[in-house]
Amino acid sequence: MIERNWNELIRPEKPQIETGADATRKARIVAEPLERGFGVTLGNALRRVLLSSLQGAAVTAIQIDGVVHEFSSLEGVREDVVDIVLNIKQLAVRMHAEGPKRMTLRATGPGPVTAGQIETPADIEILNPDHVLCTLDDGASVRMEFTVNNGKGYVPADRNRPEDAPIGLIAVDALYSPVKRVAYRVEPTRQGQSLDYDKLILEVETNGAVTPVDAVAYAARILQDQLQIFITFEEPKAKSADESKPELPFNPALLKKVDELELSVRSANCLKNDNIVYIGDLIQKTEAEMLRTPNFGRKSLNEIKEVLAGMGLHLGMDVPNWPPENIEDLAKKFEDQI
């Protein structure tokens, strides 16, 4: 059965999400348990896709009144144009439409000029409005125009310069990815009595254009889409729930272990010492047999009778074909009914 290649691998539970004060920018995502080696496999693949392949928006070109090239300086502006361009590269932008789009900045000194002073169209958001672009002296003023586009990955300035670029247009390196940092580590984790499994811990930081949780989801979807072409066979038809579960000649609740019942420590220890593991073992005992169990008294008997009554069961029941040979496998198959 080819499906055993993937069906018999352990699958992680729903990821645990840990966020700090700003859940829109930083999060730790934990997935466990994973088969040995899958922590590095998945962590490395997700990290590479997160940093390289998510769509975002960035400034691709600027024009500053009175500036012909990026090695100029502006009277009354403390930073030179090279520093201003570096500051502009750190703008965090979210676009709700296809680009390119234009933004404008007009400012008068004295004081710092921040990203929040940029005039944007309705479909553009500035996500770090307190970010300082430059500082003006008293009486100085500045006017800039920005071209914003959407894309993925890193695009160098020379590819952002149009062939018919006007004099004074400064092309900017564009880093479109909304993901600023990704780190992962793999730790051993327990599954049952075994420590031979992986726990993947992803730490993701974004610029706020997308949440870390959504960024990981998009990266996983990209990987899913790219890997799909390698699946060259038809999936075996999944069995329905009724087909996959055998008929039981007894109540599935009998497959529940007695240590899962809310019993006192004394009662639980008595059952354990008498090798009573499943409820199916317990209900076949009579009251007299239970009272002959060492340290088992009338109080424990009444406690167990009350718990069984709540399940529609009682002591002294006859259960044909108990215990079944594959009792542990049956308990897993019917755990949703136990």
Curated annotation (Swiss-Prot):
GO BP: DNA-templated transcription
Described function: DNA-dependent RNA polymerase catalyzes the transcription of DNA into RNA using the four ribonucleoside triphosphates as substrates.
Name this polypeptide is given: DNA-directed RNA polymerase subunit alpha
SMART domains given in the database record: RPOLD
Organism expressing this protein natively: Caulobacter vibrioides (strain NA1000 / CB15N)
Top-level taxon of the source organism: Bacteria
Molecular function GO terms recorded: DNA binding; DNA-directed RNA polymerase activity; protein dimerization activity
Region (Alpha N-terminal domain (alpha-NTD)): 1-234
Keyword Manganese part of the UniProt annotation: no
